[in-house]
Amino acid sequence: MITRLRALLAAWTSAVPVAAVVLLALTWGRDLPGAVVALVILVLAGAVLAAVHHAEVVAHRVGEPFGSLILAVAVTIIEVALIVTLMADGGDKSSTLARDTVFAAVMITCNGIVGLCLLVASLRHGTAVFNPEGTGAALATVATLATLSLVLPTFTTSRPGPEFSTVQLIFAALSSLILYGLFVATQTVRHRDYFLPVTRQGEVITADGHADAPPARTALISLGLLTLALAGVVGLAKAVSPVIESGVAAAGLHHAVVGVVIALLVLLPESIAALRSARRDRVQISLNLALGSAMASIGLTIPAIALASVWLSGPLVLGLGATHMVLLALTVVVASLTVVPGRATPLQGGVHLVLFAAYLELAVNP
């Protein structure tokens, strides 16, 4: 019975990513009728679950924190490609697309995913435990990247409006790449233990011990299917975005809600993977996924946009407004206080979720 279930799981998690990419190719750039939209949403949900499965297979093979890093970088690279493609298409709102998408990713990961994982882990296990050294380093990097890329443009004077000059944009891009590269080296080479799960006594857990690691061939196949699944998730989310826009407009909501919904869809694989780790009392893996995604979103998007600006026309607005800067500052302060003790109660999770709810509420009613 167990063998049959495993065979069935392997079959559908292999078929769905391929189906998602095929469906994406058939629907890209077309007006979709209601029945096709329903099919797209169904395949999108399947692709999310398949991505989580294959990410866990790869993570089991390479170990932590490499597994979390692979998923975060894979999602972000595809997301960056989508942003550049949409900006190349032009439009009135393309000038703020990179800023809105990156900030949405930061708020979703640092408040939504972190808050939910801390809440789930602390309710199931009493307290959520993690390594404050590694988590603090990740948070400091996210805060620095966000400030340099999203806050400073609001106050620079070389260009009118919240924009960087060419030299400033190059500096921000290089700084983002350097900081992200330093973090990856720290996470995977010099101080890998800082990013591994810990016991309640503070001892590092180097292996889960549930089962033997999958063969290299299986891991490579899962890596390829993971890439297909993530491409399908991001692309199908874009394919249904006109339907989302129509629904948001019909509900009388602000247009920024569209970006939030799409960002939520794109980050679903990481969100589910992080929650599953939190349920298993591996909160450090959850935080690696959340903060790693926020970091990759800024650290890879800004350099890509800087490079794309060579051929993209029109302004590139990166600076946040006052309301979003307040939310970002409060997020950094609260997250710092959460990280310092190395353990969290449901209160800390609730605080982050309230901040995320405030972000959503202000997106609906700016």
Positions of PLM-derived features:
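Hydrophobic alpha-helical segments, chiefly the membrane-spanning helices
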Residues: 1-366
